[in-house]
Design a protein with these regions (language model features):
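Surface-exposed patches in mature extracellular/periplasmic domains of secreted proteins
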Residues: 104-105, 150-157
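Membrane-penetrating hydrophobic segments
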Residues: 1-11
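Surface-exposed acidic, glycine-flexible loop patches that form ligand/cofactor-binding
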Residues: 60-66, 90, 145-150
């Protein structure tokens, strides 16, 4: 019986070693293409004061391909991502750019502390961990868009008003710099 147990354990060890030594394959992520026209998706986002999802509004011209530019626009303090996306449709068609407008809601990111200031400090003045700050949400938004679109064209990050303050601080205070152009207005 001891011989059978030894053989069984040897076989299990051999299989485990073989599996461990095999080349690792990247986990394939499901790419959910963004349809032409207006659309929306929501992602799980751990920053902010609750577990609410963070919604992204899109406008994709019919002739847009992954080789064309992506324009990610952060709204002002009015928190109107969907309206920004609608307002940028003409620009999208003229420049053949995919428009992405995240909506950082007041409920999830209350006040300037969580939006313009990026959630860097808590109410007691303590510095939050980098992954807890709103700026890390911007990095994940860019990553989500790149994954969904397989974008190879320029990635433009734009902020208007409060969004301009947010993007400006993101660029200065540790954003991943995984974009090609950063532009801010009226901040």
């Amino acid at each position: 019986m001891g011989n059978k147990v030894f053989k069984a354990l040897t076989a299990v060890a051999a299989v485990a070693a073989a599996v461990w030594l095999l080349p690792k394959r990247k986990k394939e992520m499901a790419v959910r293409p963004i349809p032409a026209g207006e659309s929306m998706s929501c992602i799980r986002e751990r920053t902010g004061v609750n577990q609410d999802a963070l919604c992204l509004y899109y406008y994709r011209p019919g002739r847009w391909t992954e080789k064309d530019a992506v324009f990610i626009a952060f709204h002002g303090f009015g928190r109107a991502g969907a309206e920004y996306c609608k307002a940028l449709r003409k620009l999208a068609e003229e420049r053949n750019m995919l428009i992405v407008c995240p909506e950082l809601t007041e409920r999830k990111y209350p006040g300037a502390e969580w939006y313009q200031e990026g959630g860097i400090m808590d109410t007691d003045g303590h510095i939050r961990e980098k992954e807890e700050r709103t700026f890390s949400a911007a990095d994940r938004i860019v990553a989500e868009v790149k994954n969904r679109t397989q974008a190879a064209g320029k990635i433009i990050l734009f902020g208007h008003s409060a969004g301009g303050q947010f993007v400006h601080r993101w660029a200065l205070l540790g954003g991943k710099k995984n974009v090609d152009v950063i532009a801010v207005a009226n901040s």
